[in-house]
Amino acid sequence: MLHSSLHPSIPQPRGRRAKKAAFVLLSVCLVVLWDLGERPEHILQWLMLHLASLQLGLLFKGVCSLVEELRHVHSRYQGSYWKAVRACLGCPIRCGTLLLLSCYFYTPFPNTTHLPFTWTLALLGLSQALSILLDLQDLAPAEVSAVCERRNLNVAQGMAWSFYIGYLRLILPGLPARIHSYNQHHNNLLRGAGSHRLYILFPLDCGVPDDLSMVDPNIRFLHELPLQKADRAGIKSRVYTNSVYELLENGRPVGACVLEYATPLQTLFAMSQDSRAGFSREDRLEQAKLFCKTLEDILADAPECQNNCRLVVYQEPAEGGNFSLSQEILRHLKQEEKEEVTVDSARTSVMPDPSMLPQGPELLISSMDQPLPLRTDVF
């Protein structure tokens, strides 16, 4: 199963398997119809008739939706009735084509049911009305999820963009300078290669406490980084601050880094606790995973930010499980330092040894008394 590099439980975006399965179904049905001995032109005519009937049923459904949308034409469509019609029925050329196809393909067929066209049309409208009243055509949860992901309509996707634009994009470009200033006043505490980033914690259960030491006593608050101020949304000199934490192992300091939770996860957790939001625990878990994946994709296209932070995604086991948040952070710190060393060694390997290069300009002097001409045909 495909999953993100952040955590095994975070899925990748949906692919095109549904359309591939539909293509296989189409092929199988055509083979079955061919084996039944029907002529190809009859198969094509019946296929077009049924396809036009299905689309005509969707047209009836769109008309029913239009009746409701006309009540909101000023608030939802800026007073444009044409926009309301397009939102419910789609392109008018398409609707007219479907009506013509329905009439055209109904005419040449023998009337096996002995029903006139108006009866057939009325029965089609009746079946569509019953489907609407009984909610027989509601989208499946997987279809709703796919549509929302494809159009960036999920709660988590909006939160991820808000977290990036309203926070990370403001503080991450200037983070190295603030860490450098901090090191000058605190004995170069954040000297490791992995300590020059902001580590953002992503618990998939959305449990975000305000005190990290309550989660793990081996995480100890040390200091705050130098403040960053910026004018934001009418607020003059808005203050942004980040905290430096020390990581302990067997009572001894083994590392330090700039650390914090992803604050939008608190909102997801609060929504799941409020009945007015209609947000279940399953919805919360799905949106938390999507939040992580969306933020990862956003940072991947932001070079000025992606090298200044690392996402620490984890899922605490059930009761009785052995999980240490400090050890999880240490693992990411060591991995970051290992990757930095690997990159540095790769850069060093492609650079020539300075001792092998000439230290100054050299003059190449010929032993001949007269200079040679540029032409070679004089010899």
Swiss-Prot record:
It is a multi-pass membrane protein. Residues 153-340 are annotated as: Cyclic dinucleotide-binding domain (CBD). Its main location: endoplasmic reticulum. 2',3'-cUAMP binds at residues 167, 238, 263. GO terms for biological process: autophagosome assembly; cGAS/STING signaling pathway; defense response to virus; innate immune response; positive regulation of macroautophagy; positive regulation of type I interferon production; reticulophagy. The chain crosses the membrane at residues 18-38, 43-63, 89-109, 114-134. Residues 338-363 are annotated as: Disordered. The keyword Endoplasmic reticulum applies. Phosphorylation by TBK1 leads to activation and production of IFN-beta. Following cyclic nucleotide (c-di-GMP or cGAMP)-binding, activation and translocation from the endoplasmic reticulum, STING1 is phosphorylated by TBK1 at Ser-366 in the pLxIS motif. The phosphorylated pLxIS motif constitutes an IRF3-binding motif, leading to recruitment of the transcription factor IRF3 to induce type-I interferons and other cytokines. In contrast, lacks phosphorylation site at position 358, leading to reduced production of type-I interferons and other cytokines. It is found in: Endoplasmic reticulum membrane; Cytoplasm, Perinuclear region; Endoplasmic reticulum-Golgi intermediate compartment membrane; Golgi apparatus membrane. GO terms for molecular function: 2',3'-cyclic GMP-AMP binding; cyclic-di-GMP binding; proton channel activity; signaling adaptor activity. In absence of cGAMP, the transmembrane and cytoplasmic regions interact to form an integrated, domain-swapped dimeric assembly. In absence of cyclic nucleotide (c-di-GMP or cGAMP), the protein is autoinhibited by an intramolecular interaction between the cyclic dinucleotide-binding domain (CBD) and the C-terminal tail (CTT). Following cGAMP-binding, the cyclic dinucleotide-binding domain (CBD) is closed, leading to a 180 degrees rotation of the CBD domain relative to the transmembrane domain. The pLxIS motif constitutes an IRF3-binding motif: following phosphorylation by TBK1, the phosphorylated pLxIS motif of STING1 recruits IRF3. IRF3 is then phosphorylated and activated by TBK1 to induce type-I interferons and other cytokines. Keywords: Cell membrane, Cytoplasm, Cytoplasmic vesicle, Endoplasmic reticulum, Golgi apparatus, Immunity, Innate immunity, Ion channel, Ion transport, Lipoprotein, Membrane, Mitochondrion, Mitochondrion outer membrane, Nucleotide-binding, Palmitate, Phosphoprotein, Transmembrane, Transmembrane helix, Transport. InterPro entries: STING, STING_C_chordates, STING_C_sf, STING_LBD, STING_TM. 3',3'-c-di-GMP binds at residues 162, 167, 238-241, 263. Facilitator of innate immune signaling that acts as a sensor of cytosolic DNA from bacteria and viruses and promotes low production of type I interferon (IFN-alpha and IFN-beta). Compared to other mammals, STING1-dependent type I interferon induction is strongly reduced in bats, suggesting that the cGAS-STING pathway promotes a limited inflammatory response. Innate immune response is triggered in response to non-CpG double-stranded DNA from viruses and bacteria delivered to the cytoplasm. 2',3'-cGAMP binds at residues 162, 167, 238, 263. The record marks 358 as: Not phosphorylated. PANTHER family: STIMULATOR OF INTERFERON GENES PROTEIN (PTHR34339:SF1). The gene is STING1. This is Stimulator of interferon genes protein.
